[in-house]
């Protein structure tokens, strides 16, 4: 009887997992949802940055950067952060290198390049450029990004900017 109960439970879990997977995003849907977000990093600030972000981020969007536990900010703060990068690294580019899809989650491996226009994170301006890796895990809801967990290798960027 115990084995039968375990089999029924396992079958139920497998069925639930398969149903959730079947309802997941396609690769095309995932790229369509994330591409506008990354394009914000690849262009000079033109037009209303807030309107652009509201088109791709849910109203309750959270950006979690992972350096401190529970360190997340909402859509309005994210708008300020992206605008700040556009000013401090005007030639910043984010190139999507790889996209993996798991249900409503989209994992993006990207490469960030740029040349700071002034001091960056306390490193004096040198005119040098950097190239770093970034990993993002995006949760998509109703075609928009609802949450982002992201890590960028800023330590490497600072090392490149300080190099002799």
Language-model features, listed with the residues they occupy:
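N-terminal signal peptide c-region/cleavage motif recognized by signal peptidases
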Residues: 17-19
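A solvent-exposed, acidic/Ser-Thr-rich amphipathic alpha-helical stretch
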Residues: 50-103
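Short acidic-aromatic low-complexity motifs
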Residues: 24-60
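Hydrophobic helical h-region of N-terminal Sec-dependent signal peptides
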Residues: 9-14
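Bacterial N-terminal signal peptides that target proteins for export
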Residues: 1-8
